[in-house]
A protein has these predicted regions:
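N-terminal small/glycine-rich loop or linker at the start of catalytic domains
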Residues: 2-20, 52, 61-62
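Short, solvent-exposed beta-strand edge segments and adjacent coil->beta transition regions
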Residues: 9-11, 37-39, 138
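Catalytic core of soluble alpha/beta enzymes
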Residues: 42, 47-177
Length: 178
């Protein structure tokens, strides 16, 4: 209430990094689904993208997935992004360099899967610029990265005004006092 919240429940998802094998990943995803997680985020990297997604989609044809590229690709990888369009992902998180929203806009125009910005989201002005050029359809807000709660709420409001979904990601700081 203090921050203007309108809901009492927040859905959480399960996140999986690169695993030792597809079988290990599929087992971990099954455990997350059995536990009740409504969606799963998969980290991807070169050599752990198209074939991994093919295995995941084959095993879980109806589950909600999105991928996080952690800025690991470039526009030169457009053919790979076009291949993963067929896997019916909710979105692709931070596919390109965090300081290049122009390339994100170009990628967004070239593929069917929506783009989510994460590392690029450093403050309200960047978000306004990204939305103006259609660089993304989702925004991940990390209060520690954007300058605290005031800026996080500003970014939320900017996105809400244009119908772009947001969520609050990690990087939540804490400290141990003496």
């Amino acid at each position: 209430k203090l921050l203007g919240g309108t809901t009492r429940e927040v859905q959480a998802g399960a996140d999986f990094g690169i695993q030792d094998s597809f079988d290990m990943l599929l087992g971990n995803i099954q455990t997350a689904i059995d536990t009740g997680f409504p969606r799963v985020k998969l980290k991807v990297a070169r050599e752990w993208d198209v074939e991994m997604l093919r295995a995941v989609r084959s095993a879980f044809p109806n589950e909600k997935f999105h991928i996080d590229c952690n800025s690991g690709y470039t526009l030169d990888d457009l053919d790979m992004f076009k291949k993963i369009d067929k896997f019916n992902l909710e979105f692709i998180e931070q596919p390109l360099a965090n300081d290049d929203i122009i390339d994100h806009a170009e990628l967004a125009r070239s593929i069917g899967t929506p783009i989510c910005l994460d590392e690029s989201v450093t403050g309200p002005r960047v978000v306004e610029q990204a939305l103006k050029i259609d660089a993304c359809k989702f925004v991940n807000i990390k209060p520690g990265r954007v300058g605290g709660l005031t800026n996080a709420v500003r970014i939320h409001d900017i996105c809400q005004d244009v119908g772009v979904p947001v969520w609050v990601g990690g990087m939540l700081e804490s400290a141990v006092g003496s």
